[in-house]
């Protein structure tokens, strides 16, 4: 949404001096988009986090922040968040990825008439397992790494689409992009990169050269595809599954 608005031809005709707060959520805000938004409006994006199961929100950055942090902020009052591993143990090492788990008054009681599905996502001590992988810094701020199910396993190495997209979004000539995992005979999975051009003259060779200089080898895309638009939900979240499923 922020990217689409900031790139709209009429965006610069608006006087943004009275814009006080811009709150981002729904999907991770890319640093390149946050910078573009700040440059054009003078108002930093304040990113928050929540899911349907934790409506409307579980964490947020301070609205008084003067710059984009790249984090989802701190848990809201009365809310507890932690990181857990695949066995349900708490991850306490700073910077170590784990699944974000949330406990608070906004967390659902369960899925309607689906006790089996509820049991899969609720821990014994009442935390909801979000399916999002995150890290926590020394201040207690959380940062989303990616959806657990979207992780790409390349020759045994974990590749998170968000980290690839964050880099490629800064490539000159790129409007927006998405990275997904596709089956590969040699590496098990490989990175597929789908790009919407800002510069119509952008070439695959330029994208690959940029990736070679900014991404480690196993994170570089095996396939680069250009499209006029990316499939999205009504609220603007990229539908990665449609990019994976399309042959």
Residue ranges and their predicted role:
Residues 8, 104, 109-110, 117-120, ...:
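AMP-binding/adenylate-forming catalytic core of the ANL superfamily
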Residues 21-24, 179, 223-226:
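Hydrophobic/anchoring residues in structured secondary elements
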Residues 1-2, 29, 107:
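Alpha-helix capping/helix-boundary segments
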Residues 74-78, 89-121, 159:
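Conserved ATP/PPi-binding loop(s) of AMP-dependent carboxylate-activating enzymes
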Residues 46-53, 73-75, 180-183, 225:
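Beta-strand->loop->alpha-helix junctions that form or flank phosphate-binding loops
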Residues 26, 50, 73, 132, ...:
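Active-site glycine-centered loops adjacent to acidic/histidine catalytic or metal-binding residues
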Residues 16-19, 76-78, 174, 221:
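Core-facing hydrophobic residues within beta-strands of well-ordered domains
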Residues 6-67, 80, 87:
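Gly/Ser/Thr-rich phosphate-binding loop
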